[in-house]
């Protein structure tokens, strides 16, 4: 089982062509707000191997859903 990756918005650059630009990119880790919405704290997330980006303040619902699915998969494997 692979660990989830966080998606974040890319910055807008004036020199990029809009049709070549991707809206999202893989981030450094999940924000604290995303972990809290998924029912985790920082210590438990790090014990599970989830990377935490403490500098990021944004909360993306896609990342919260990814974390919830990951936790469900973990609970299914344990039982």
Curated annotation (Swiss-Prot):
GO terms for biological process: translation. It comes from the Archaea. One of its GO terms (molecular function) is structural constituent of ribosome. InterPro entries: Ribosomal_eL13. Keywords: Ribonucleoprotein, Ribosomal protein. Belongs to the eukaryotic ribosomal protein eL13 family. This is Large ribosomal subunit protein eL13.
